[in-house]
Amino acid sequence: MVPPRHHPGAGRPGALSSSPPFRLRSSKFSGIALQDLRKAFKIRLQMVCVFIMNRMNSQSSGFTQRKRMALGIVILLLVDVIWVASSELTSYVFTQYNKPFFSTFAKTSMFVLYLLGFIVWKPWRQQCTRGFRGKHATFFADAEGYFAACTTDTTMNSSLSEPLYVPVKFHDLPSEKPENTNIDTEKIPKKSRVRFSNIMEIRQLPSSHALEAKLSRMSYPTVKEQESLLKTVGKLTATQVAKISFFFCFVWFLANFSYQEALSDTQVAIVNILSSTSGLFTLILAAMFPSNSGDRFTLSKLLAVILSIGGVVLVNLSGSEKSPGRNTIGSIWSLVGAMLYAVYIVMIKRKVDREDKLDIPMFFGFVGLFNLLLLWPGFFLLHYTGFEDFEFPNKVVLMCIVINGLIGTVLSEFLWLWGCFLTSSLIGTLALSLTIPLSIIADMCMQKVQFSWLFFAGAIPVFFSFFIATLLCHYNNWDPVMVGIRRIFAFICRKHRIQKVPEDSEQCESLIPMHGVSQEDGAS
């Protein structure tokens, strides 16, 4: 009978099978290692969560910007359709009632319908009450400072105060004694002491961050109430909107009057083509008076505008059924209207930096009110000078003017300004070029107008300039023309590489004496 085999180290102290002290220490070490592993896993999980949240926030912000751009493009396309239909209806009205000033005055005065919002919309009435603002005076002051800080392009380091160095007082905690003294403490690793600096740096955030700090310390219902107030304080007051409307009332009326005069002298397609030159004026004015980063001047934007201007020249050289003299007058009125439209959109975007800051219906409501109160003496001036005789239209023409004013002016101008705020001022003005193919089709179908090949050759570059400007603004002022010029310049003027020449002693010098090594090898 063969006796059972025993492990060679089974009877020695400290063996795995029979040593209780080692089993106790190993279990303690495994517990400590498990706790460290859990802490490391928890920290790593938190880091992953933070990384995912940051990625989601960055993607959501980019998605929001893409949604704003897409919504603005859709709105501008809808405005183009409305404008072409309105232009055709205006041309029909001018065949029976050629009064551009009366038509412009009547349609602009219809903006006053937006002021009915003071009756049906409570936030508008709250902006006119002093008690509402006085009740929350402290919050409004903090919020105004917050919005003022948001509009400025400053970094966090520049907004911090000067550093203040204060000595640090450390309080050493009493060392904790282990509960179980039977455990071998010699095997437990000692915690390393970390030495900190005796001086700490203190910087104070600016007062513009007081609103966020205050909201972070409030309860959830209070925060929701303050957020509703924040939406109100972020907008301009009724008095401020009225002041802006008073200035832009004259600019907008002259721009629209020039457009109406152009429609009375030439075809709709030619007027829309020449009106697209507002992109050039917008590019120049936006570079001089930028409202945001999207208005920055780039060489690619200039090339897109030049492409549009080249198409405009071809369109102007094309023949049409009307006399050349009236075409010239209509072209001049179109260019004047394009310049005034550029002044209008650039200045209003510089005055109001965000679309949620200005109540667009209230703005146009005050424009209609000031137009109705201040511009009526123009009838007497034009009548007695013989430029336009005053005559009241018949019922059919009056109905066409009312419908055209409500849809082609009141609704379309609101949508166009909203689309400009969602995209950029350059895209909003170049959106006028998209009325070209629609107006061509409308003139050919309704008025049987024949255009030469120069007209179509000029319409194509004007049409594509809009999409070029949209892509450039979408990709954060991407300037491929400047990038290409820089690469070509770098390729032509590149420096020749220094090549190794055998006569150069420094290049041939070796740090290791190879001849010595070869001699030793040869000797061996």
Curated annotation (Swiss-Prot):
One of its GO terms (cellular component) is membrane. The gene is SLC35F5. It is a multi-pass membrane protein. Residues 253-317 form the EamA domain. PANTHER family: SOLUTE CARRIER FAMILY 35 MEMBER F5 (PTHR23051:SF0), SOLUTE CARRIER FAMILY 35, MEMBER F5 (PTHR23051). Belongs to the SLC35F solute transporter family. It comes from the Eukaryota. Coiled coil: none annotated. This is Solute carrier family 35 member F5. It is found in: Membrane. It comes from Bos taurus. Residues 13-22 have a biased composition (Low complexity). Putative solute transporter. The chain crosses the membrane at residues 69-89, 101-121, 244-264, 269-289, 297-317, 328-348, 362-382, 396-416, 421-441, 453-473. Residues 1-22 are annotated as: Disordered. Keywords: Membrane, Phosphoprotein, Transmembrane, Transmembrane helix, Transport. The modification Phosphoserine is found at S207.
